[in-house]
A protein has these predicted regions:
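Alpha-helical transmembrane-bundle signature of multi-pass membrane transport and export proteins
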Residues: 1-249
């Protein structure tokens, strides 16, 4: 939940920065969501294969340290003043997240018994849902009171804390005898094999389709909440951060 809550600070900050750099252009603000989505989509199949070839715990630590360094570098260098830099920040943070998520998903069955796996997945899903409300509300309040830079710094700290916590966890595979080969040809064969597995099983392909439809509708909803929140005035705060945070809770 530390990461999920922290993510809202940066996501909300990027929306506000994109609006500030473009005179609150809805297209520019939507560009933040578009950059994140179009970076995730082609990248996750590749980063997912890394979790079959390299230690998952190490990948999670590296992903969080990378995101921490990126955020601190952008803050210290003042590289968040142009629309291009906001999009670049969004893209780089997605690289870290796309590396972290598959490693975390593959790590869980290695540290849980089979009868514990359902509960563990439910806790992760519940934590993600709770963090949407908690993170959005906290981010909206903090950024409206203390500014975008403070919000970005808070998220950078959550990446560092997460990396430290993960480093204390047990090894989560893959074991040396389980690791796949790392050649590019084998990696792309695995991608096509994965899609073949999905398409041959209607019950799985329906879940994948539903996930895609939910993401499309959810993205549109988030965008509308952002626009409404930026136009609303909560407690005479003109930045729109509080408005977005309250509506996203």
């Amino acid at each position: 939940m530390i990461l999920y809550i922290g993510d809202w600070f940066t996501v909300l900050a990027m929306f506000l920065l994109a609006g500030e750099a473009s005179d609150n252009s809805p297209l520019a603000i939507a560009g933040v969501l578009a950059v994140r989505s179009f970076t995730f989509a082609p990248l996750e199949p590749i980063t997912g294969m890394l979790a079959d070839r390299f230690p998952r715990k190490t990948l999670m630590v590296i992903a969080n340290v990378f995101s921490f360094v990126v955020l601190v570098a952008f803050i210290q260098s003042g590289m968040v003043e142009s629309l291009f830099s906001v999009y670049l920040l969004a893209m780089l943070l997605v690289v870290g997240r796309a590396t972290y998520d598959p490693a975390q998903t593959a790590y869980l069955p290695k540290v849980c018994d089979e009868d514990e796996l359902l509960t563990a997945n439910a806790l992760i899903s519940g934590g993600w849902s709770a963090s949407m409300g908690i993170g959005a509300g906290l981010a909206g309040f903090v950024i409206s009171q203390y500014g975008v830079e403070t919000g970005l710094m808070i998220d950078s700290v959550t990446f560092l804390v997460a990396a430290i916590v993960i480093s204390t966890l047990p090894h989560g595979g893959p074991d040396p005898d389980e690791r796949r080969t790392g050649s590019p040809l084998e990696m792309f064969k695995d991608i096509f094999a994965g899609w073949g597995f999905i398409l041959r099983r209607p019950q799985i392909s329906r879940i994948v389709l539903a996930k895609g439809m939910w993401a499309t509708g959810g993205g549109a909803q988030i965008f509308l909440l952002i626009i409404i929140g930026m136009e609303a005035e909560f407690a005479d705060i003109e930045t729109g951060a509080a408005g977005i945070g309250v509506l996203s809770m």
